[in-house]
Amino acid sequence: MACINGENRDFSSSSSLSSLPMIVSRNFSARDDGETGDEFPFERIFPVYARGTLNPVADPVLLDFTNSSYDPIWDSIREEAKLEAEEEPVLSSFLYASILSHDCLEQALSFVLANRLQNPTLLATQLMDIFCNVMVHDRGIQSSIRLDVQAFKDRDPACLSYSSAILHLKGYLALQAYRVAHKLWKQGRKLLALALQSRVSEVFGIDIHPAARIGKGILLDHGTGVVIGETAVIGDRVSILHGVTLGGTGKETGDRHPNIGDGALLGACVTILGNIKIGAGAMVAAGSLVLKDVPSHSMVAGNPAKLIGFVDEQDPSMTMEHDATREFFQNVAVAYRETIPNGSSVSGSCRERRH
């Protein structure tokens, strides 16, 4: 299997796939390898664990690291998992199965997704084959899963570690499942892509159409109730909170969903309808209903949303400061402008004067 870090293993032998191994009852400590000087024997715990029947390819797809074995995020995830297994022994089997028994982030993430999304007719082994085979062949997805987990770690104070994001945060997991479904959609495997969309919606409560186009470094905070329509486009470094709807209007085909610019911040329960553009670095306050274009680096709020100010920050999605208080406007917003970037006048009700 093509992995960014670690040695390739052969999981295709019939003996390894005949049955799933029983989980041993003894809790192993990551300190064991320090005492003996040998590498920690993960295979003694999980020699095979619902890995599927992956067929390695002759030309592995690797990220363009100077040293292809160097993957700092995956290295951090493994170190975090070792410490967490020692701090909470009851989770040691779960951590070894989900992270420490795998060779790379792609394989571990495929395992987690497969086991979260499986059902009696979509088996974990089948799903892991699907996820892994897509991830290890696509450089863009390999980059995205790392930039996304970095976004969660940097922007969500509730995200304690990289490992907690890939194991527990449904916004991150739903986003990565979408990325695989999107690739399948572009390959013409639309029925499978829609089946994955349906399972993600059932399990995580997040509905992202596989034809939507979403950039890298995305934070899908909480994720509950997020709906992203078929022709929606989302740029890079965007932060989206729970309950956001990027919906269409009417029943005509073609572009009928919003286009969200780079670095935008969409607050909780925002609804944006139709083929309208949210400019780069724009902020949409929680609970807003947006029915027309929003200028870049502006802030809108209300139902329907109205322009209430501008922001100096390049990417407000990175700071997550979306409370429209007087202190916020005095310190972050540009308090008084006669015109908005397209040259239109700003009405008096849309101005925030400094005192």
From Swiss-Prot:
Tissue expression as described in the entry: Localized in vascular tissues, particularly in phloem.
Pfam family name, one: SATase_N
Name used for this protein in its record: Serine acetyltransferase 4
Protein family: Belongs to the transferase hexapeptide repeat family.
Quaternary structure (record): Homomultimer.
Induction info: By cadmium (Cd). Induced in roots and shoots under sulfur-deficient conditions.
Listed GO biological process terms: cysteine biosynthetic process from serine; sulfate assimilation
Subcellular location: Cytoplasm
Species in which this protein is naturally found: Arabidopsis thaliana
Pathway: Amino-acid biosynthesis; L-cysteine biosynthesis; L-cysteine from L-serine: step 1/2
Coiled coil: none
Substrates-to-products reaction catalysed: L-serine + acetyl-CoA = O-acetyl-L-serine + CoA
Highest classification ranks of the organism: Eukaryota, Viridiplantae, Streptophyta, Embryophyta, Tracheophyta
EC code: 2.3.1.30
Domain of life: Eukaryota
Principal place of residence: cytoplasm
UniProt keyword annotations, A-Z: Acyltransferase, Amino-acid biosynthesis, Cytoplasm, Transferase
GO molecular function terms listed in the Swiss-Prot or TrEMBL record: serine O-acetyltransferase activity
Mechanisms controlling activity: Feedback inhibitions by L-Ser and acetyl-CoA.
GO CC annotation: cytosol
